[in-house]
Amino acid sequence: MITNISIFDMDGTIVDSSHRQATLPDGTLNLDAWIENATPEKIFKDKVLPLAEQIRKRHKAGDYTMICTARVMSEADYEFLMNEGINPDKIISRPLGNTEPDGQLKAKQLKSLFNLKQFKKATKIMFDDAASVRSALRKIGIATIHPSKVK
């Protein structure tokens, strides 16, 4: 029986991809530029952040581990994670063509998954650097932590 679920965002939480990010005048992510910069060459220049070690630790401790990212995942993204030894039980990502705000997207995807019998009663915690995501997930009963709060 699954009792604990640890969920990790990618960008800004377990992966530093800031070299590929562009923002709009209001400070939000320029999704079109992000997708344009999602080439294998640029993805392989991403850096793993220290919190990524928690995925390994929590998995070893028996947690069901997940990545929930607003990225549209490509083969290069999966290869990058594998090369870095980041092997969660499940990865949830943005569907191609979806432009929903990150918090809304992640809340919808996780709520749907956590309605499944095996996940309903588990304790759920999400590590995410985005305040809007943390707020949206708290509204559906998922505890959230900013990566800077983890020692």
Task: Enumerate the predicted regions with their spans.
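Alpha-helical substrate-recognition element adjacent to the catalytic core
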Residues: 2-100
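Short amphipathic alpha-helical segments and helix-helix/interface helices
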Residues: 52-56, 110-111, 134
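Alpha-helix termini
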Residues: 55-59, 114-120
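Short alpha-helical
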Residues: 72-76, 105, 132
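Short, aromatic/basic amphipathic alpha-helical patches
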Residues: 78-85, 113, 135-141
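Short loop-to-alpha-helix "cap/lid" segments that border enzyme active sites
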Residues: 81, 101-116
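A short acidic, often aromatic-flanked loop/helix-cap motif at beta-alpha or helix-coil junctions
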Residues: 96-103, 132, 150-151
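Acidic, Mg2+-coordinating phosphoryl-transfer loop and its flanking beta/alpha structural elements
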Residues: 121-151
